[in-house]
A protein has these predicted regions:
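Helix-start (N-cap) detector for alpha-helical repeat units in TPR-like alpha-solenoids
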Residues: 51-53, 86-87, 118-121, 153-154, ...
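Register position in tetratricopeptide repeats
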Residues: 30-31, 64-65, 98-99, 131-132, ...
Length: 385
């Protein structure tokens, strides 16, 4: 009897220690000390075996710390061990979404929804379809999510983005009006309604939305850009110039803003419009690095075509290269050589003549061009052309 009592007390003490250890792990997690929590859990599993509650804590540590691969392995195992626990499947869905495995996220999400219509799951399935640009399916799930939780700004914003893309402005206005009637200061939905109002040419109403955002402390590019657009549409050109300049101060990457400011200043017969056109033209200049890389790509393509006897492709690629690098004069005699190999001696002669003046006397390029001209003239003489 004493032995049995001792065993019971022993196991109770082990259970108590395990509970204390688990409490300590959870405290570490609350302090975002996930590495320490994982180390403790690993030691506990070595001593106690892979108990489900330990595996769950370990999976959560990996999930919270962003270690998606380990979290995916752990939650896959847990979902097999406890198939009725939806939390594990929700985490799997989230991990697949994080990893851009959208089909897998959709499949798991649909399985969850057969058991429970969870708003967040509906939304995430919609997000997965949206990432795949399957807008109709995304719209359906967003609408289902809103049917269960109508006042959801995140889902409403995503649904309205789809509707704006289809120019369904009236429906966007109906949805956003209803939302803003309850929450008029919402900085997520106000700009959505403002854009829809602007698209419907309700410029005063659109201006009111963006001004309200500004009054609420929103002072970003989009606010001033649309205030500028509204002012311009209403003929308030000074106001438009001011707002577009404020937009430019916040984001100087939109060449159309620079062009608009230049036009507004010019139309007002004021000084300084040239500066804004210069800004715009500078922005419109292609990136020299991109030009160089593109020219090199066409040159390499041409050389490969030449080596493989595809002279038509070689000619086409050298001509494209000259669009990006017109001073690459060697391309002229390379094109000439291709036409020569195609026995199109007249065209070859023209290209050798084009190449000749670009090379100085005594240079290798000049020699290639001049001997090429001599050969082509001889060929044409024998052909009586």
């Amino acid at each position: 009897m004493r032995c049995r009592v001792s065993l019971i007390l022993f196991f109770l003490s082990l259970a108590s220690l395990a509970a204390q250890d688990l409490t300590a792990v959870r405290e570490l997690k609350q302090l975002w000390k996930y590495d320490e929590a994982i180390a403790s859990l690993t030691q506990m599993m070595a001593a106690q075996g892979p108990r489900p509650e330990l595996l769950e804590e370990l999976a959560d540590c990996h999930y919270q710390s962003g270690n998606s691969a380990e979290a995916l392995d752990q939650y896959t195992l847990l979902a097999r061990m406890q198939p009725d626990k939806l939390l594990f499947r929700i985490r799997l869905m989230s991990l697949f979404y994080r990893g851009k495995q959208y089909d897998a996220a959709i499949d798991i999400g649909r399985g969850i929804l057969q058991r429970d219509s969870i708003t967040q799951v509906l939304s995430l399935v919609g997000d997965a379809f949206n990432q795949q640009e399957r807008r109709d399916s995304a719209e359906w799930y967003y609408r289902q999510a809103l049917a269960r939780r109508p006042h959801n700004e995140s889902v409403l914003n995503k649904l309205c983005s789809i509707l704006l893309g289809r120019e369904q402005h009236d429906e966007v206005l109906a949805l956003t009006d209803a939302f803003l009637a309850e929450e008029p200061d919402n900085l997520t939905i106000l700009p959505v309604r403002g854009i829809a109002r602007f698209a419907k040419k309700r410029y005063d109403d659109a201006e009111a939305d963006f001004k309200h955002m500004n009054e609420l402390g929103e002072n970003g590019y989009a606010v001033h850009y649309y205030l500028g657009q509204c002012a311009q549409k209403n003929g308030l050109l000074r106001d438009a110039e001011r707002e577009f300049k404020l937009a430019w101060q916040r984001d100087s990457t939109d060449v159309n803003v620079a062009l608009t400011i230049a036009q507004l200043i010019s139309d007002a017969r004021k000084d300084g419009w040239e500066v804004w056109y210069d800004k715009a033209l500078t922005m419109l200049q292609p990136d020299p690095k991109v030009i160089s890389a593109t020219a090199t790509a066409h040159q390499n393509y041409a050389l490969s075509a030449y080596k493989n006897g595809d002279f038509d492709r070689c000619i086409a690629e050298y001509k494209k290269m000259l669009e990006y690098s017109p001073k690459h004069y060697a391309a002229y005699y390379m094109i000439a050589q291709c036409y020569e190999l195609k026995q199109d001696f007249k065209t070859a002669l023209n290209w050798y003549k084009k190449a000749q003046p670009y090379f100085s006397e005594g240079s290798r390029g000049r020699e290639i061009a001049e001997t090429g001209i001599q050969r082509m003239e001889a060929e044409l003489f024998f052909l009586n052309e």
